[in-house]
A protein has these predicted regions:
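DNA major-groove recognition helix of helix-turn-helix
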Residues: 45
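Active-site metal-binding loops of divalent metal-dependent hydrolases
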Residues: 85-90, 116-119, 157-160, 184-187, ...
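Conserved beta-sheet core of the metallophosphoesterase superfamily
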Residues: 152-154, 158-241, 448-530
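Core catalytic region of metal-dependent phosphoesterases/phosphodiesterases
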Residues: 58-149, 168, 290-418
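Short alpha-helical "recognition helix" segments of helix-turn-helix
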Residues: 29-32
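Short, amphipathic alpha-helical "recognition" segments used to contact nucleic acids or chromatin
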Residues: 7-25
Length: 534
């Protein structure tokens, strides 16, 4: 049988390869299947026979595949702090930024992890992936495989997305299943993903890049060059397994960057630096999460809050009031009204006092509290316009006081009068230093517009992330309760409870704040279990 000459067709040869490489059969077992000698199979597999087939096969495999998802076989990263970034083929690194990252990793005991992507291979006459060149300075940091960073967080090092992709996170919403994911890409983006109500929201993050701009000078390349970020994502894992992610965004010329109160350079670092501003997640005082309040701004709680650690020059407050006592959404709901009655939470004045107390907790000599006009705050004036004090005895006196103040203001021609600000000052005259922004009043922190809540878009339409993107400037906003970053627009989350009663079903809400540094770069921090960092 072994001396018999066999002539296989192409389909047979492909099947032999499948049996060998996918099924893992021995040459002897394959020979039995084809009723031929073992040497016949061996000669074919070593390329001694069927040279025409091998010429074609080596140019492009005729068939391949895998039953199992190899991406589920994730490497488990060792350590408690990681810095993720990306690098492009045939492109020099930003030397100063890389050195600043290396400084960071040395000081903070962190691991630098770089995932590679390729672009414009034809421009370098690169025919095969193995011909790609990467700057030797980062080769020791390259990880191009999926990694488990912590419970609930995966690094997608295997993902290769063109740097010209407008929405690099598109299509990845369930790629990491029930976990959050870090995706290597030159942009800095973040998206909140919904989870069942009793679970934390998931996130998708991109990393920014450590390599220089290197684009084809056409439409897609020009746009990508504009949005190219010298950046990285820091991930810390504490002893309880909770992980905390935040963005690093380097200065273009110097390669230096802030991370919380530290400033890193190619030569070293400084600490104890103050930040420029913090945009708290929407406050909703009547539904405030007390743990978030203690962690974020309260005094004398046994540890330094975010406010007293980072000492921002400005605190931006959105939806300071919730207006739960008399909200237009449930003012005609008898069951809700009875619940408010039994809970003794019907008094609008009491809710205003509670809101004023929250603002008072935020006051510091080093920081100005700025209240951004928001839809829940302006609901108070809507209440004055639409409701009848005669049918609301518990609020009648306060209603009439506020209504009279409003009419006096209109009589004087004071178009800047705000009912919410007036109500706060009525119950807490000591808060006169708090600044209340008016409708469409601009408030710039560095070059970032912070005077918009997020409920209004353009031309009177509803607010959306795309509406702010199109305006051509950077924004820090709130309103959605779902933290996000997209092309210069940053969304804060919520400081109130994650379940406010009306947000039924799955939720993408998170208790997240925006930090703006002295150089105008930003990061988002998300609180978990009363913690905001490792």
């Amino acid at each position: 049988m072994g001396n018999k000459k066999f002539i296989f067709g192409e389909d047979h040869l492909v099947e032999i390869l499948r049996l060998k490489h996918q099924e893992g059969l021995s040459n002897r077992s394959i020979a039995k299947i084809f009723n031929c000698g073992k040497s016949t199979i061996g000669d074919f597999l070593t390329g001694k026979t069927y040279s025409d087939f091998w010429k074609q096969y080596h140019k492009k495999p005729l068939a391949t595949g895998s039953v199992e998802n190899k991406l589920e076989e994730r490497k488990v990263l060792k350590g408690k702090r990681f810095v993720f970034t990306s690098a492009q083929n045939n492109t020099f690194v930003h030397e100063k930024f890389l050195k600043s990252l290396e400084t960071y990793c040395e000081v903070m005991d962190a691991s630098l992890i770089v995932s590679t992507f390729h672009y414009n291979k034809s421009g370098y006459q690169l025919n095969k992936t193995k011909d790609l060149w990467y700057d030797p300075k980062i080769r020791g940091y390259i990880v191009d495989e999926p990694c488990q960073v912590a419970e609930g967080l995966v690094f997608g090092g295997e993902i290769n997305i063109l740097p010209t992709a407008v929405n690099p996170l598109s299509g990845f919403h369930n790629y990491f299943s029930h976990e959050s994911g870090v995706i290597p890409h030159v942009k800095i983006q973040m998206e909140s993903l919904p989870s069942p109500k009793n679970e934390s929201a998931r996130f998708l993050y991109t990393t920014g890049a450590v390599t220089q701009r290197n684009y084809i000078q056409m439409k897609a390349g020009n746009k990508a060059s504009f949005h190219h970020c010298f950046g990285a994502l820091v991930v810390e894992v504490d002893e309880e397994g909770d992980w905390f992610a935040r963005q690093i965004h380097a200065e273009q010329k110097t390669g230096c960057f802030y991370d919380l109160d530290k400033y890193f350079t190619p030569e070293g670092f400084t600490f104890g630096n103050n930040i420029e501003a913090i945009n708290y997640g929407d406050v909703h005082a009547a539904k405030l999460d007390e743990v978030v309040a203690k962690t974020s701004w309260e005094k004398n709680v046994g540890h330094s809050s975010i406010l007293d650690t980072l000492k921002p020059s400005y605190q931006l407050v959105h939806d300071a009031m919730d207006q739960q006592a008399r909200n237009h959404h449930n003012i005609k709901d008898p069951h809700f009204l009875f619940e408010m009655f039994t809970n003794k939470t019907e008094s609008l004045k009491d809710e205003i006092i509670k809101t004023a107390n929250v603002l008072r907790e935020m006051e510091r000599d080093f920081s100005e509290v700025v209240v951004v006009e928001s839809n829940h705050d302006t609901a108070l004036e809507k209440y004055l316009k639409e409701q009848d004090y005669r049918k609301d005895p518990i609020n009648a006196v306060f209603f009439l006081e506020l209504q009279l103040d409003k009419y006096y203001a209109m009589e004087r021609g004071n178009k800047d009068f705000q009912t919410f600000e007036n109500a706060i000052i009525r119950v807490a005259p000591d808060l006169y230093k708090v600044r209340f922004l008016k409708t469409d009043e601009t408030f710039r922190v560095k070059d970032i517009e912070c005077g918009q809540h997020g409920n209004y878009g353009v031309n009177g339409s509803r607010g959306s992330i795309s509406a702010f993107q199109k305006q051509g400037i950077k924004f820090n906003v709130g309103h959605s309760h779902s933290a996000a970053i997209k092309d210069g627009v940053y969304y804060a989350g919520v400081s109130g409870k994650l379940d406010m009663g009306y947000n039924k079903g799955g939720s993408s809400w998170s208790q997240s704040h925006i930090l703006t540094y002295k150089n105008g770069k930003r990061a988002i921090v998300t609180l978990k279990n009363g913690k905001w960092r490792s």
